[in-house]
Amino acid sequence: MGAPLSTTRRGMGQNLSVPNPLGFFPEHQLDPLFRANSSSPDWDFNKNKDTWPMANKVGVGGYGPGFTPPHGGLLGWSPQAQGVLTTLPADPPPASTNRRSGRKPTPVSPPLRDTHPQAMQWNSTQFHQALLDPRVRALYFPAGGSSSETQNPAPTIASLTSSIFSKTGGPAMNMDSITSGLLGPLLVLQAVCFLLTKILTIPQSLDSWWTSLNFLGGLPGCPGQNSQSPTSNHLPTSCPPTCPGYRWMCLRRFIIFLFILLLCLIFLLVLLDYQGMLPVCPLIPGSTTTSTGPCKTCTTLAQGTSMFPSCCCSKPSDGNCTCIPIPSSWALGKYLWEWASARFSWLSLLVQFVQWCVGLSPTVWLLVIWMIWYWGPNLCSILSPFIPLLPIFCYLWVSI
């Protein structure tokens, strides 16, 4: 036939280095077929050939889910080719561009609590004192360590939030005060909405109650019908404009609205008196007259630059002044109580009962009002036999 191959073998392309993209021919097990390991070792010793680095790394599951067939001599003698399921470590990711260009990686900064423990104190004063340190200030203002430089770091969300809701170094907001401050307006808004929805039904209900006082057997038909303006049968509380009883219904509802406005005015006076907005001089003991004006013996004048006078003065004929300070709260209520007690001595017996009522919480008062609103008429009919016992109970209450 001929002599063995003495020249460089060419096959699988002009290049002697045959790539191995599919991972076949690991460890050159098929080289003896081409006599590459015997008489023509040029295949293994070709410096330009691919060394096939991935040939020996047959991934687990490359020939099926979780299985590598033990093909032995065909695929090589690696543990993967022998059917041993071993996981080879993955190659590290390639280096980034900036590291190839010579830039060194940024070292990990130590924790702030280790380098500057004084900056970790939850105290605004100590925190601002720590900012005086240039090293600590450089952490927050990298551009020169000053907030007045042209190059400032981008503000964070936390800094924006703190700058909106509070000043730098200011005290933390008290959530209890915020909640209590919002609860009052919400309750008032709820009451206003309730009154707006009931603005027509409340006068009508009161009108029905007022009219029912004249008709114990129930509300009859409206007696205001005549032949000139015939109307259908209706109640006296819902007269149409063509009915002669319409003007009386309007008069009753107008009086009801006046009483509602009077109740609102009383509620406003009570609120202002509780907040100390009504500086009423109390009655001076032993005198029935009070007056406000400059006092010779008072440290603070009754008529001064302040919004409200701080003391009340009684001016007898001799010119001497008796000064009594105005209460900071319930000034009008105390004045009315002293005025009524001076004229009706039996009211002094109710002092303990009034003090007990004042000591009740608003929740108890709201519960009592709600019970009277719904169960009041029924309770009146049930408790009517016991009404004569009420004075005896009050006397025993005061005496004990």
Curated annotation (Swiss-Prot):
Positions of glycan attachment: 320
Pfam families hit by this protein: vMSA
Localization, UniProt: Virion membrane
Annotated spans, Disordered: 84-114
Annotated TM spans: 182-202, 254-274, 349-369, 376-398
Alphabetized UniProt keyword annotations: Acetylation, Caveolin-mediated endocytosis of virus by host, Fusion of virus membrane with host endosomal membrane, Fusion of virus membrane with host membrane, Glycoprotein, Host-virus interaction, Lipoprotein, Membrane, Myristate, Transmembrane, Transmembrane helix, Viral attachment to host cell, Viral envelope protein, Viral penetration into host cytoplasm, Virion, Virus endocytosis by host, Virus entry into host cell
Region (Pre-S2): 120-174
Span list, region Pre-S: 2-174
Domain comment quoted from the record: The large envelope protein is synthesized with the pre-S region at the cytosolic side of the endoplasmic reticulum and, hence will be within the virion after budding. Therefore the pre-S region is not N-glycosylated. Later a post-translational translocation of N-terminal pre-S and TM1 domains occur in about 50% of proteins at the virion surface. These molecules change their topology by an unknown mechanism, resulting in exposure of pre-S region at virion surface.
Family per record: Belongs to the orthohepadnavirus major surface antigen family.
The name this protein goes by in its record: Large envelope protein
